[in-house]
Amino acid sequence: TISTEDCAKLVGIVFAKASGADLALISMNQYFHDDHSQGNGDGVSGQIFALPVTDQEIVAILPTGWRNNIETYTLTGKRIKELHETGFDRKNNGILYPYQLVTKDGFTIDDNATYTVVICGATDAVKEEGNVQDTGIQGLSAMEDYLSQFETLSAKDIVWE
C-alpha cells in the first residue's frame, strides 16, 4: 500500500516532470466516505494498493480527475515555503489541508529565487499572484505514462532524482 503522503509525492513528481516544473506543492486530505463536505477535491485523498491499477483507481488519487490539466505557477522560494507551512484553505473557512512539498533529491529552495511550481490546491489569490498557467498536459495521461514504466510500485520507488 502506498500512503496518502506518498501518493501526493508521486503526483508531485509526475506532474512536475511532465510540465517541466522545478517543484510541486500537492495538498492532501484523508477520504471521508460518508461526509464529502470535508473533502479536498483539489488534492490527494487516497492510496494506491498494488499495480496494475485501473484508470478509475488512478483518478481516485488525482487532483486533476479524469480530464483536467496540470497547472503551473511562478512564485518565489519564500512564497513557496510560506504556502507549504500554512497549507491550503480550500473553502476559506480556516480548515487547512497540508501540502506535500515535492522536490528533486538534494534540491534546496532559495527564498529569493523564482521557481515554476505545480500546485494542486491553490486559492484564487495564489492563482492570480502566481500567474497560473494551464500546461495543456492532462493529469491522468501524465500519470498513466509514468506508471507504465513500473511492474510493481512501492514507496521506495517514489523518488525524484
Where are these regions (language model features)?
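Catalytic centers of hydrolytic enzymes
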Residues: 1-161
